[in-house]
Amino acid sequence: MSKKQTETNRKKDCRLAACLTAEEKLRLLTAAGGFETESFNGKLPVLRAADGPCGLRIETAEFPKGAPARCYPAPHVLANAWNPRVAERVGQALASECIEAGVDVLLAPGVNIKRTPLCGRNFEYFSEDPFLAGQTAKSYIDGLQSAGVGASLKHFCANNREWERLYQSSEVDERTLMEIYARPFAMALQAEPWTIMCAYNPVCGVYASENPWLLKEILREKLGYNGVVISDWGAVHDRSRALKATLDIEFPHAPASLDNLKEGLEKGAIAQADVEDSVERILSLLKKKEAAGERRKALPVAEREKIALDAAREGIVLLKNDGVLPLKGKVRVLVAGELAEKPSCTGGGSARVTLMAPPSPLSAELKKRLPQGEFPYLAGYSYSSCTLPLALCQSTGVKKARLAAFESDAAIVVAGNNQLTETESYDRSSLRLPPEQEKLILALAEENKNVIVVVEAGAAVDMTPWADRVAAIVYAGFGGEKINEALASVLSGETNPSGKLSETFPLSLSDTPTGEERGNGFFERYKEGVLAGYRHYDFYDLPVLFPFGFGLSYTRFGYSDFSLVQTDAGAEVSLTLTNEGETAGAEVVQIYVEPCHAPVERPRRELKAFEKVFLKAGEKKRVSFSLRPSDFAFYSVVYHRFVVSGGVYKIAAGASSRDIRLLGKLRLEGDF
């Protein structure tokens, strides 16, 4: 927007603000109800917001937990696709759902870093890596807002576990905040989200909703955000302090806040200028909403369903395959596990989606693609038994499944978590699958050497008790309402899997950056600093079950002809990628920067670029990347900005963080 346009808009906002009384301006700073702003008898347009990142959750008298809605793959599945276009298309589809429901702002996406795999909301978040999270979130927002529906980027900031999230302070140092936890927000801000939502938790002892260092100094001054900041629902503790920190709209309506603001003005805790600045930002948002009306055109339902299916397929990660996949021809395969019939489409809490209709069973979807095959189904466990101390009928189910597995060519076990075990407000107590599921996997593995385990979960799970006893492992995540169609497509070979892990799968909880610690209820120190996710495992040379960026295919890819050219603007990296197999497929080329020497402790390597490349069998393609000076930088607490240290850097190209195929070096002068 030009300076002239900005000034014109400012004058219009001033005229609109002049129509509001002093009390109306204060009332504008808190919502009119649960999810909408004040209109003052038609003086202002109403802004309506709704959850959530995987599909709409709109509560009604008839549907108190949310009216039936279309369910899309969860954000972590979009990140596992490693394809920003997938996230953009899902954003466009979600915008269509909002348009039909009269929603102006979707309360998504969340870009909080997956600091611990136990966090109950990890399924809502993209990655343990800020670059991958930021890139995917930016595309999600671009898609959503291209159709005239605003995004609410959340939860700013350092909201990385659900346990005691309302009270426990995240004690994080400035460098760690800027390099890891604020970084995905900074990248997503390139998409100009309409709003940003603050977190519930305190940061360095001050609630995020009223933290001037966090909202004013970091978000607005350092990151350059000048839009509306809204609260998470019930996150405001002192409305005047929140306003002083530049929080604009409190959700939901809080009757006491009006008196709090009046008292704040009387006592000088806030100034009228603070009110006017916030009102101006809100009016600009309302005007943006009105101007977006002409872009609000919903996609056809059939197109949205295809987007959901494509995203679920592309986000599936093949973790192990001893040759049993893809399934072919006249084959008899036992399909076991209640989740095969009643899949985990998404997690619980505000991101929960009430399905329009139950997904088609996995056995039925496999039969469609392999009509000569047989796919008998046995539960083997019921999910209620996984959460109760006694499961009296469990042994009978396992006995039947054992016999069926013995009589089959292969057996598929669908295991994982659901909306009760991965949900807002609670963290998981363990990385392990429910014991009944592990027992079923091990029992079938004793009867059949071709056991295929499908895992539906929103974050890493501990597979060590059974991973080496099965023939294949497929990580589907929470794939939305099309999850079984997507799974059948991959298992049958109709789709070649191309997903990669957006987080490390550790060998044990004690190996993770946070270990088994979770704070004391009052505060939690981010002692690992910038060594989040794979940075931690690589720095300490820890073995992992599956590394960040890992994922198999039904074909093979070769990397060759590496070129690294240093330029005034940074560096140009290129290589040749070849599909060396007999099946078309896609590979994610990942570029990591490795500082050889540094004045501060730095991660061994960090992701700085990636591209998903689709190749026919035998096809080759030249893939190029541009690295900027900022890709070599770290945050200096001395200068309070990102700086580049002079010295030698390695540029690594690979198929995962631990599968480096090509390597080059360059020397930078740096800032000092």
Go through each PLM region and give its residues.
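Extracellular and select intracellular beta-sandwich modules with Ser/Thr-enriched
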Residues: 660-664
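Glycoside hydrolase catalytic-domain context in secreted enzymes
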Residues: 1-637, 643-658, 672
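Short beta-strand edge segments in extracellular beta-sheet folds
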Residues: 665-671
